[in-house]
């Protein structure tokens, strides 16, 4: 891992609580990333922050460090088993990842963490919360469920964090977010932080209504895609699209890659071809059960799978190390999703490769994407006669059977 992505700001030179510094030292964190270097001097003083920085630049540790520090330095004069900090994420996977990243800080400080997300573990999550929690990390639906049942009260909240804030304030979340924030103490009585790779003016305007004179921080505003990510664009016909993907996989031979498509059906089709070709490939779509979803991500992270085929459920916030390639089999309909997708590679100072297909169906999305990222994606040509022409017969997922989540789960029937 390179250190070029770090700033000259040392954690040890910040007025951090000694237990926080000890935890950071144990993880060999010496220098801040730019978003940490700009946000921590403010949040450590109790000032609200809305931070925008590229994916993989340390936003999670920025708000976790500030959250733990604030709780340690603002101890209440009463005993409570109710949460003192609320961290909200748009997806279950991201909530789990945040909790994982917080473990080392929790072990050192003895602050209690609990998760609350839908789709799995209702009773287990409930028991953990009832035993007492300092920092609650979760998704809006499950958190609201516990609030309405009277299990959780937010009277003692001192810190609120919205991670991937632009998605949180999407039309589907805004009412839930405002419901929860109205249950918390007033903005002047708490520290509130927003972080995201994309943060539009409209979102900032909505968010600032529930913040206390926040400071807006933006890192590398002129380049929304990481400068360590090499981008490449092909214009395949629909007929050539799968053959081009298989050919590029053979030529590039990526160590670990994610292939994004816009629909579950398309992801299943891609998975079917790659699994039939003998690739170690996993399938991550919205209907994969939560336990399988987490197991699949662990297999991919641990190197048991080389390729992950996914819808945008995997594009936001997940910290999957050493992803060398990202393929946009379909150009996303939402231009911001392009940034989040290719941000799966080129993380923490490493280089990466992004290859996109502007096919007949989705080429119309390209102008909006290029306008948003501020540059044209370099175009490469291909020779149709040089593509792999003996594609395997793809595996098909039968709807009356359990959907396999990786190629090794597949059995021919």
Swiss-Prot record:
Which parts of the sequence form the motif Q motif?
A: 9-37
Record's subunit section? Component of the RNA degradosome, which is a multiprotein complex involved in RNA processing and mRNA degradation.
Q: Where does ATP bind?
A: 53-60
| Organism superkingdom | Bacteria
Boundaries of each Helicase ATP-binding domain copy?
Answer: 40-217
- PROSITE patterns from the entry? DEAD_ATP_HELICASE, HELICASE_ATP_BIND_1, HELICASE_CTER, Q_MOTIF
> Which intervals hold domain Helicase C-terminal?
241-388
Where can the motif DEAD box be found? Answer: 163-166
Protein known as: ATP-dependent RNA helicase RhlB
- Any keyword Oxidoreductase? no
Function summary: DEAD-box RNA helicase involved in RNA degradation. Has RNA-dependent ATPase activity and unwinds double-stranded RNA.
One GO cellular component term of this record is:
cytosol
Gene transcribed to yield this protein: rhlB
